[in-house]
């Protein structure tokens, strides 16, 4: 299986962004880990807490490459995070955490707080994490599980699933689903939009009436090998383009549309430097090479 992912993290109406996303991809171990943290309002240095937790958990994965992914591995990573930073700082801070650790066809999903994880299969949400939230006597919601909040209630809920080709895992902070647009968000996640459009559609929904930072990771599980020679050509073309323009990171699992002998492939790319999405179209006639059009420049490719 091959994993594609895309992210966004925006400040919204707040003065600073306390959300943080960290990703580690380890193709030699057929393993990836994705962590999203949301620094808690009302605590000092929420942006510091979210970065510390996300980076430390990801670093734990890269420092322990031979250790199989497991519930205990997640708990050990969380415990090490707490020990490392509690020993360094007494400053009040807090953060939620939601993560996906994928190894082969197994995904471990873990969260504490109100950052959420969704699993979408065949255009249907088949799993949604449960928020760790309670109401005060006055009716205000409070987070009951988080890092660095002066209690030991940071142990995450952990769910193990077997992933299938076509599955998507969506991880987000509460700023994404908490703006009153849940119905539109759910329809989009379960809809039939091609994957390249999906992340930008979700980001647009999250930005409407945003009251908080909003961040998300969208992960797509794809097949390792293309199904036919035409698909093989497109995979090779994608690798060539990625190698010649490493500023752009493709996050799309290809969508094909046949028009007589022609094929049209639409590919979304995320520019790390510019923080924006770029849109490119590759069009080719079977057996006659390809043309890649991006940013009003056309590059001919006649490989195979």
Question: Could you say what each language-model-derived stretch is?
Answer:
Residues 20, 249-252:
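Short, polar loop/linker segments at the starts of domains and inter-domain junctions
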Residues 125-127, 250, 298:
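Residue-level detector of beta-propeller blades
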Residues 266-304:
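Short, mixed-charge low-complexity intrinsically disordered segments
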Residues 242-246, 254-280:
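A short, charged, amphipathic alpha-helix used as a generic interaction element across diverse proteins
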Residues 1-237, 241, 245, 257, ...:
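PP2C/PPM-type serine/threonine phosphatase catalytic domain
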């Amino acid at each position: 299986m091959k994993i594609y992912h895309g992210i966004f993290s925006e400040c919204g109406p707040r003065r600073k962004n306390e959300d943080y996303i960290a990703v580690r991809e380890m193709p030699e171990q057929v393993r990836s880990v994705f962590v999203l943290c949301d620094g808690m309002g009302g605590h000092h240095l929420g942006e510091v807490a979210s970065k510390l937790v996300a980076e430390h958990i990801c670093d734990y994965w890269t420092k322990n490459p031979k250790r199989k992914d497991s519930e205990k591995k997640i708990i050990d990573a969380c415990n090490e995070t707490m020990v490392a930073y509690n020993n360094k700082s007494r400053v009040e801070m807090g953060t939620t955490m939601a993560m996906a650790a994928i190894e082969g066809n197994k995904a471990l999903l873990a969260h504490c707080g109100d950052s959420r994880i969704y699993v979408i299969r065949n255009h249907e949400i088949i799993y949604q994490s449960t928020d760790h939230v309670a109401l005060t006597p006055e009716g205000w919601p409070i987070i009951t599980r988080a890092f660095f909040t002066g209690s030991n209630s940071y142990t995450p809920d952990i769910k193990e699933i077997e992933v299938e080709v076509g599955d998507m895992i969506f991880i987000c902070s509460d700023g994404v689903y908490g703006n009153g647009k849940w119905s539109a968000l759910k329809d989009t996640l379960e809809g039939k939009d091609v994957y390249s459009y999906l992340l930008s559609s979700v980001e647009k929904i999250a930005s409407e009436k945003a009251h908080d930072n909003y961040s998300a990771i969208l992960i797509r599980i794809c097949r390792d090998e293309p199904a036919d020679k035409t698909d093989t050509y497109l995979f090779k073309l994608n690798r060539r383009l990625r190698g010649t323009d490493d500023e752009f990171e493709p996050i799309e699992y290809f969508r094909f549309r046949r028009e007589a002998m022609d094929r049209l492939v639409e590919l979304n790319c995320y520019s790390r430097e510019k923080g924006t999405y770029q849109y490119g179209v590759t069009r080719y006639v079977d057996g006659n090479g390809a043309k890649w059009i991006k940013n009003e420049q056309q590059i001919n490719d006649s490989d195979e």
